[in-house]
Structure formats: C-alpha cells, structure tokens
C-alpha cells in the first residue's frame, strides 16, 4: 500500500465521521490552549513572586546574623571568617555592618555645638564593598580605603534623611521646636529644612567619659560627609537615617574611647534562657554580615 493510498483512506474516514473529526480537532485545540495557558500562568506566577521578593530586598544579597549564645562549636563571624567567605566562587563582596557595644558620644553641629544627635545610628563597613553592594547615591561618592582627609578627620556617608536626627539643645524637651521631622511643613505648606546641612555645616563627633568624680573627658573628631545614600529600607536602615564610616575608623574610635575611659571592650549583657539554662551572649564576632553574589541562581 502506497502512502497516497493511506492518505486517501484517512481522508475518506474523516469525511464519513465528520462529527467525530470535528470533536477531535476541537479537543486537540482546546487541550493545546489549556497547556499554553497553564504554562503562561506558571511563568507569570514565578515572575510575580520574584518581583515581590525583589521589592523586599536584593535577591543577590545574603544576610548572615550572628548567633552567639551557648553553642561553643559555632564559628566566630570575625575577619578570618569573612576572608573565607570572600574566597568562595560567585561572591562579589562581603562586609559587616558593625556597631560597637560601648561607645559613648554625640555628634555636634552649629555654633557651640547647639545641634546634636547620638552615635547609636553609626555603622562601620568595608569601604571596598559598599559600591558593589548596589547602594544608590543621591549626592557625592563612596569613600575608599585609602582616602585621607587629615588628622582627626573621618570620611562618612549618611542616609538621605540623617539631618533630621539633630535636635536643638537650646529648646526644652517639651518644645515642639526642639526637633524638625521629615516631611514637616510650615504654615504655608512648605517643607521645613533640618537644622543642619550635612554637606556644608561642620559636624564634630565628640567622645565623652565622666569618671567617678564627675570629671568629664572628651575627644573630638571632624566628620566629613563624602556621600549621601538614596533612602531604601530594603537595602538597609542606614540609607535613610543612619551614618556609615569605614570599619577601620569605627574601630579606631572604639579604641580611642577605651583609652579615654580607661576601660576594656565591654561584653554584651544580653541573656537568653534555653531548656531552663540561662546563657550569656558571647563575643562571637560581628553582629551582621552581608554577602553579595553575582547571580540569584548562585
């Protein structure tokens, strides 16, 4: 039997069973369309989920938080561990966001230090990693590890709304004029600018320690703003209201305060209870470390 005979036989059968043929064709078309629609819905769902997760933060960043209670076998999240992480494949950058446990001081600006804010919002980071971590700048540039501004001058980067942290110390705590808040407007609906222009006004970080006799010791450092972050809480809090300096500079300040106060680095006083046993937090390295990889699939 030739191929032409097979084709003729098939055609004749289809013509004799027109209803069945039509239903078969409709079934094939509907089934194909259903498969295409389901695949499309699956792809769209994946894309939507990835977009939703991306809105919460950078999917190529891994956050490592330090667990420092109890388990002695937990590796310390220190500089040695960070270097091991940097050596892994696909790792683009690694940096801790370091905050010392014991650093008493304030940031001053204005005549006679009229405007002030605390140092609790200061973080230390690896200067070679910040730009690679994908932070956006509203103004200025990233500081570098070899940047030198002179003796007792520290380059810093601030969040977009950092200036709103300053308070007017000449106003009472009950005064509505002691602090200007982000988004605050005047009677004409115009935005009220903060007391301090961080890009123009001088800012001084003052370490202070008061001994048992009530005598205060201080040491001052000039802060020079080299860059301002675009506010993005999905990347980190400090992009809005915090301050970042080089890790080495923050550790230098920590050592300077220890020398000023005559004390050693204070251990954390944090405790937790597990299985009825009270455990004190141990000094197990940095509190948080961020790792940037080259691709979300890695």
Please provide the spans of the model-predicted regions.
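N-terminal Sec/SRP start-transfer signal
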Residues: 1-36
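N-terminal plastid-targeting presequences
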Residues: 23, 118-119
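Alpha-helical transmembrane segments
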Residues: 33-62
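N-terminal, intrinsically disordered, polar/charged segments of Gram-positive cell-envelope systems
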Residues: 51-83, 87
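Basic-flanked hydrophobic alpha-helices used for secretion and membrane insertion
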Residues: 76-87, 92, 101-114, 120-124, ...
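Residues that line or immediately flank small-molecule/substrate-binding pockets and catalytic motifs
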Residues: 98
